[in-house]
Every structure is written in C-alpha cells, then in structure tokens.
C-alpha cells in the first residue's frame, strides 16, 4: 500500500510554513489583538531584562511558533486520545498559571517565584508530552528556550519586583491576561 497522504503532506507544509513565517504579521492571522498586546509586552520586558533585542525577539518568535504549531496540530485533529488528554491538562495548567500571575500582581506581598516557576515548568512538561511524536527535536528545543527564560526565578523576581520599569510592563501583561481570562481565551 502506498503511504502517500495529501492530508499528511498538507500538515507538514503547514508546520514548515509556520516555522518559517513566525513574524508578527503572520501571527496576527492566528493570534487575536489582546494576545498580540500581551506578546508585545512580554517582548518589551524580555528585552529590558536581557538587554538583548535579538534574544528577546528570538524568545517571542519561538513562543509564537510554539502556539501556532500547537494550534495547527489541534485544528487538524492530529492528537490521539492520550495526547488530547495531555493538551487538556496543559490548557488547564495554563489557565491556572494565568490566574496565579494576575493574582500575584493584584494582591501585594503574595508573589512566590517558586510557585510561578513550578507552574511554568509543569506547562513545559505537559507540552513536551503532548507534542512528542509530532514535532522535531528543534521544536522541543524552542519550547525549552521559551520556558527556560520565563520560568527563571531571577527573571520572575525582577518582573514582580518593585522597579517601576517592570511594574508598568507587568501591569499591561496582567491586564491583557485578565481580559483573555474573562473572554475565555485562556
């Protein structure tokens, strides 16, 4: 039997296209305005923290690729039942992470970087498990690159610290995340 499948070919083409075109313009086709604003703030705070524009761009580009590829796989029904259960656990963990991030911002003296870091690392592991058979080692490395940055305890402590520079970014991030939660997008 011939193993050629146009559906698989189209999916491979979509994944390849997404990996080559993870620019802001293309992301806007897949990511709504609020998400885009949150990503912009994550870029700004990352650039401020790393003092490296190129590294900040790479982290956000990898984040966008990760989100878009996950969406392509999900919309094309590529996950088996076990993987769908992992995706659902990932979605719930991201929801918990978002609620925790906003809560830590809104309620003074509640921030715990270990809690945030652990939630982010839990998300990373669930994502790796869900996409394991679908994406390349390079995609897994991108996931690690993104999560290594955002789960870094020093980064989190700086982001949630008293510095007015970071406070402004955190406020905009949390306002966007809160809006996404209200709209059921997280």
From Swiss-Prot:
Entry keyword set: Coiled coil, Cytoplasm
Keyword S-adenosyl-L-methionine carried by entry: no
Protein name: Tumor necrosis factor alpha-induced protein 8-like protein 1
Gene Ontology BP annotations: negative regulation of TOR signaling; regulation of apoptotic process
Main location group: cytoplasm
InterPro entries reported in the protein's UniProt record: TNFAIP8-like (IPR008477), TNFAIP8_sf (IPR038355)
GO cellular component: cytoplasm
One Pfam entry name: DUF758
Subcellular localization: Cytoplasm
The UniProt record lists the keyword Coiled coil: yes
Coiled coil: 37-70
Family: Belongs to the TNFAIP8 family.
């Amino acid at each position: 039997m011939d193993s050629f499948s146009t559906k698989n070919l189209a999916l491979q083409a979509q994944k390849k296209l997404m990996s080559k075109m993870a620019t802001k313009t293309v992301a806007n086709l897949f990511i709504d305005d609020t998400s885009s604003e949150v990503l912009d703030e994550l870029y700004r705070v990352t650039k401020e923290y790393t003092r490296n524009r190129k590294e900040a761009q790479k982290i956000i580009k990898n984040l966008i690729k990760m989100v878009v590829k996950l969406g392509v796989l999900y919309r094309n029904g590529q996950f088996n039942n076990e993987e769908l259960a992992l995706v659902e656990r990932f979605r719930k963990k991201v929801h918990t992470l978002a609620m925790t991030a906003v809560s830590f911002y809104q309620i003074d003296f509640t921030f715990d970087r270990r809690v945030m870091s652990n939630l982010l690392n839990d998300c990373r592991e669930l994502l790796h498990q869900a996409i394991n058979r679908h994406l390349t080692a390079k995609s897994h490395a991108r996931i690690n690159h993104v999560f290594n940055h955002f789960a870094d305890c020093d980064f989190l402590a700086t982001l949630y610290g008293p510095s007015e520079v970071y406070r402004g970014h955190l406020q905009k991030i949390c306002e966007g995340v809160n809006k996404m939660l209200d709209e059921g997008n997280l």
